From Swiss-Prot:
Source organism, top-level taxon: Bacteria
Pfam families: DUF179
Entry's family note: Belongs to the UPF0301 (AlgH) family.
HAMAP family attached to this UniProt entry: UPF0301
Annotated InterPro entries: AlgH-like
Recorded GO CC terms: cytosol
NCBIfam families noted in UniProt: PRK00228.1-1
Family annotation (PANTHER family): UNCHARACTERIZED PROTEIN YQGE, UPF0301 PROTEIN YQGE
SUPFAM superfamilies: VC0467-like
Record's protein name: UPF0301 protein YPO0936/y3322/YP_3506
Organism whose genome encodes this protein: Yersinia pestis
């Protein structure tokens, strides 16, 4: 089972504040474990524009018509000072990895320099931090009914309002997440 380019959808019973009602986009899943970004937990009052200002990135070809008020996401509890840009495929960045035909992840500064210009990726989201699982940990959490899984949908990833992503991801499975009991029973 490889869950790269899948969503993990937190079950209602998951009460950990870092992951309660979260949707995680799995960027990598292999023999050594898994890595993903929470895509529905905004960092209050932190926008892409704020990040660019803090890093003193100012492009001379900045187009004022391109909005930079996108909220930055809390990607997970690990390395919360490290930025990740999830975006539609576009070549030419120093540290980019293809996740799927529709998505790439970049961690290099050069992608930030394109933001607000005609050279920026068509679709993107910016996250600080990430979530990871050691070998076998995610599989055990799935067996323990911590997460639902479904193949990722780029419309949910890039275009669905943040507050609606948890339900939208569950809808892909034909589930109204609000109708699931928060406790699991055993017969």
């Amino acid at each position: 089972m490889n869950l790269q380019h899948h969503f993990l959808i937190a079950m209602p019973s998951l009460q950990d504040p870092q992951f309660k009602r979260s949707v995680i986009y799995i960027c990598e899943h292999g023999e050594k474990g898994a890595m993903g970004l929470v895509i529905n937990k905004p960092l209050e009052q932190l926008t892409v524009e704020t990040i660019l200002e803090k890093l003193k990135i100012k492009s001379p070809s900045r187009d004022p018509a391109i909005r930079l008020d996108n909220v930055v996401l809390a990607g997970g509890p690990l390395a919360e000072d490290r930025g990740f840009i999830l975006h539609s495929p576009q070549e030419g960045f120093a540290s980019s990895i293809h996740i799927s035909p529709e998505t790439m992840i970049t961690t290099s500064k050069d992608v930030l320099e394109t933001l607000g210009t005609s050279g920026q990726p068509k679709n993107l989201l910016v996250a600080l931090g990430y979530a990871s699982w050691r070998q076998g940990q995610l599989e055990q959490e799935l067996l323990d009914n911590v997460w639902l899984t479904t193949e990722a949908d780029t419309h949910i990833l890039f275009n669905t309002p943040i507050a609606e992503r948890w339900q939208a991801a569950a809808n892909k499975l034909g589930i109204n997440i609000f109708n699931i009991a928060p406790q699991a029973g055993h017969a």
